[in-house]
Amino acid sequence: MKIQKTLFLSFFSLFIISCGANKIVYPTQIEYTANPQLILDEFIAYIELQGYKIINANDTRMTLRNQNGFFTAEYLETEWFNSGVYDEPTGKEFIIKQKVWIILDSNQISVKSVFGYLDGEEMIVFDSAPDELYRVVNALPEGLKQMVSSKAL
């Protein structure tokens, strides 16, 4: 009986701790089959509809290098976006920047979210987020993923 009680309390404690933990924000990977220019046009409209301002809407083409050589991508980057979610200890508002690479050579899209807050002149960046912030940060990547699958892009 005592072992069952101890085991139950251990599992219950683990459940409570895991529910309250921050979630790690990973880059989102999406496969596409449509014309990259069509995807770029659709993404620009969608991202701006979500309230983000795109920094480089007219200059998106770039060549990048990795261990296998060079590849070409369409790259979109947003300005910092006020999330409306505040860091509890400091009271500072989290801001979010989205970076989107539409890789032309491999039909892959990568969306990376950068988020944190300004502490004076210094930017404090995080890798994980509480649930409320996680939903705001992941709203754009998940929306883009749903758009690609629903429109068969």
Model regions: which residues?
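Sec-dependent bacterial lipoprotein signal peptides
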Residues: 1-21
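Ser/Thr-rich, low-complexity intrinsically disordered terminal regions
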Residues: 20-153
